[in-house]
Amino acid sequence: AKSLSADTSAEGRWHEDEFGYGKNYRYLSPDGHVLDLVWEAEHYQAPAELQSKILTRASKKPLQGIPVKRIDHLNLMSSDVTAVKESFQRHLGFRTTERVVDGDVEIGAWMSSNILGHEVATMKDMTGGHGKLHHVAFFYGNAQHNIDAAEMFRDYDIPIEAGPDTHGITQGQFLYVFEPGGNRIELFGEP
């Protein structure tokens, strides 16, 4: 937050407790994405009837829906991939794990702050747009899980945009669908 607040182009400010988070710093990426730095959060406590016997689970798996394990990554559309990538590196300590360059223009970058292949990706928005979300990815497990989900989506007439298949970048398993609000969701897994 100190690095971002010193950067006048980041346009950030502090916010108090919102949505179960403590004090957080909201700022704009170089492309206009609204981002929050959060480091305190209320941890979910399941009611007694939903508590899992498996201690590493926040609650029992649901009997309906898809029991994803965690949010895996965000993919942001950007007019300037390099500027967004460098902001994540300079201010948040991310490192670039993979990138795609067309001629001398960076059109994709995958970044991580830990051992994951990526937590944030940014891709060139060929429409000229600014600050858009491409998708939110949830970690679902392995290739068979995505095949099972695809069969369920077909049975219930939920349109599949792409997959199941394997990404060339990251080598992760993927399945893309749109949720009812129109947001693109990726179910992401390991090979």
Task: Show where each model-derived region lies.
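Short helix-capping and hinge/turn segments at secondary-structure transitions, especially at repeat
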Residues: 89-97, 116, 138-145, 155-159
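N-terminal beta-strand motif that seeds the catalytic metal site of vicinal oxygen chelate
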Residues: 49-82, 95, 131-138
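Core segments of cupin and vicinal oxygen chelate
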Residues: 76-117
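Short helix/strand-bridging catalytic loops that position acidic/His residues to coordinate divalent metals
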Residues: 124-126, 134-137, 164-167
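Vicinal oxygen chelate
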Residues: 1-67, 70-79, 109-110, 157-191, ...
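Short glycine/serine/proline-enriched coil/turn segments at secondary-structure junctions
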Residues: 103, 128-130, 169
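A structural feature that tracks compact, well-ordered secondary-structure segments
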Residues: 38, 87-89, 110-112, 120-125, ...
